[in-house]
From Swiss-Prot:
HAMAP family: Ribosomal_uL6_B. Keywords: Ribonucleoprotein, Ribosomal protein, RNA-binding, rRNA-binding. It holds the Pfam family Ribosomal_L6. NCBIfam families: L6_bact. Part of the 50S ribosomal subunit. One of its GO terms (molecular function) is structural constituent of ribosome. The gene is rplF. One of its GO terms (cellular component) is cytosolic large ribosomal subunit. InterPro entries: Ribosomal_uL6-like, Ribosomal_uL6-like_a/b-dom_sf, Ribosomal_uL6_a/b-dom, Ribosomal_uL6_bac-type, Ribosomal_uL6_CS. This is Large ribosomal subunit protein uL6. Belongs to the universal ribosomal protein uL6 family. This protein binds to the 23S rRNA, and is important in its secondary structure. It is located near the subunit interface in the base of the L7/L12 stalk, and near the tRNA binding site of the peptidyltransferase center.
Length: 180
């Protein structure tokens, strides 16, 4: 039995869950999410809990059991609380500004980078060096944060670049040089 898959998912009062055929739809105060479920996985609602079970007991179905339980749990949490990732820009002259539905980055290059904010994602700027990516879909929030970080990955000598707030950059010592 999957350690993650066997755990029930508690449904909050503000969340409405609908299961039809191989689709599960979760609706809450922040929005609505849907997910297609593999036919080898059964999902049912009992006593205000979502139960995820396997139809078969082969290797692939055992792998899907925990996966779909986690996906459904993230859907329920996303429509009720939402997800957030924070990024920080380090470096002299490095900054970001928002104009409409786009972010413009100055990252030490001769041109600005433009990043168009995808639908369903909210971005808050705190000053011009802090970025908060928010949304109801955990996967999309993480993907957008990773795309923004990839514009200028932190380098190990001075730590210049875009990093997650909880990320620790492994630093290297610079050249020592030979004295004459």
């Amino acid at each position: 039995m999957s350690r993650i898959g066997k755990l029930p998912i508690k449904i909050a009062d503000s969340v409405k869950v609908d299961i039809k055929d191989n689709f599960i739809t979760v609706e809450g105060k922040r929005g609505k999410l849907s997910q297609e479920i593999n036919s080898s996985i059964r999902v049912k609602i009992e006593d205000n809990n979502i139960i995820v079970e396997r139809a078969f007991n082969n290797k692939q179905t055992r792998a899907f059991h925990g996966l779909y339980r986690s996906l459904i749990f993230n859907m329920v949490k996303g429509v009720s609380d939402g997800f957030s990732k924070s990024l920080t820009i380090n470096g002299i002259g490095y900054r970001v500004e928002q104009q409409g539905n786009s972010l413009f980055f100055n990252l030490g290059y001769s041109t600005q980078f433009e990043y168009v904010i995808p639908e369903g994602i909210n971005i808050r700027l705190d000053g011009n060096t802090k970025i908060a990516v928010e949304g109801i879909d955990k996967c999309r929030v993480g993907q957008v944060a990773a795309e923004i970080r990839s514009l200028k990955v932190p380098e190990p000598y001075k730590g210049k670049g875009i990093k997650y707030d909880n990320e620790v950059i492994r630093r290297k010592v610079g050249k020592s040089g030979v004295k004459k």
